[in-house]
């Protein structure tokens, strides 16, 4: 496998994930060792835990001392978190996935404590730690999938062979771009990328794009200088922003009203929905009824057409 150039999102989330897995794992191991060394819990002041444990199933067998709770703590929150950390150090996808899973596991563990013990600061803190670990793991997973997404324009040699067709696209993260190139390669069509004049990349770009999406605004785009009237057929590829058409494509359609002969639409999104409303909006903006409309669920570069 080629060396991956991991993005900032992955690197930051990986650092956070490593912190939480090592911190929680080390705390669990130390707690388990303390229970093994002193099963009564009196030396470390943990004997107060045993009365609450009597509410649990098989308490008369498993919870008469701290040996079994120590084993459970080690196997549920100790060793697994160190395993996740090891995968993170090696930049494996499993590291991010396990971090999220073990954050949720910690939340379940603390939920049991909420049931058998009075509300206390330590349990509440560790529940928050579990939430933080889950979030760090998920963001790390997203960053990993984005960083390992593969796209190369050279893989589509037939693009541009037929000057009567054009594929137009806008893409923040290259997911829509890849699909646009696949379609252009199949049609041998020329291809045109829409470039926004507003910030759309990175964290800030995500939220800024969301603002345009929420208000259903158009977003200023560079003048492509292409005469659409010379093409017999055009395919427009757009991601979905906040359950609607992306702002740069909305602006493009406004500008090209009356200039398109035959048009097809391709949408990409994260949902199991077709988003037919976006196709109707493009029809209204362009002043033409579309020839075809396809909708693809795209989750980190994995595409599924929604029929």
Stretches with model-predicted labels:
Residues 2-159, 254-255, 276:
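Topology signature of small-to-medium multi-pass alpha-helical membrane proteins
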């Amino acid at each position: 496998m080629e060396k991956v150039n991991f993005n900032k999102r992955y690197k930051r989330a990986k650092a956070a994930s490593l912190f939480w897995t090592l911190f929680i794992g080390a705390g669990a191991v130390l707690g388990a060792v303390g229970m093994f060394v002193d099963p009564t819990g009196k030396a470390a002041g943990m004997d107060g835990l045993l009365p609450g444990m009597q509410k649990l199933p098989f308490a008369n067998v498993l919870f008469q001392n701290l040996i079994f709770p120590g084993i459970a703590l080690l196997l549920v929150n100790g060793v697994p978190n160190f395993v996740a950390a090891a995968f993170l150090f090696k930049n494996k996808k499993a590291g991010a996935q396990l971090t999220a899973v073990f954050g949720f596991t910690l939340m379940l563990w603390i939920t049991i404590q909420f049931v058998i013990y009075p509300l206390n600061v330590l349990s509440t803190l560790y529940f928050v730690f579990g939430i933080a670990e889950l979030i760090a793991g998920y963001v790390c997973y997203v960053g990993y999938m984005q960083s390992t997404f593969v796209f190369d324009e050279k893989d589509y040699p037939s693009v541009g062979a037929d000057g009567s067709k054009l594929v137009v696209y806008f893409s923040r993260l290259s997911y829509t771009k890849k699909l646009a190139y696949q379609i252009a390669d199949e049609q041998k069509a020329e291809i045109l990328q829409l470039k926004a004049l507003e910030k759309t990349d990175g964290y800030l770009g995500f939220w800024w794009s969301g603002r345009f999406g929420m208000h259903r605004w158009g977003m200023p785009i560079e003048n492509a200088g292409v005469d659409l009237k010379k093409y017999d057929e055009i395919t427009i590829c757009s991601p979905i922003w906040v359950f609607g058409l992306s702002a740069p494509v909305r602006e493009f359609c406004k500008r090209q009203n009356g200039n398109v002969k035959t048009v097809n639409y391709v949408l990409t999104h994260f949902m199991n929905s077709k988003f037919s409303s976006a196709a109707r909006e493009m029809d209204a903006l362009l002043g033409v009824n579309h020839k075809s409309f396809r909708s693809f669920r795209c989750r980190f570069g994995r595409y599924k057409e929604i029929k």
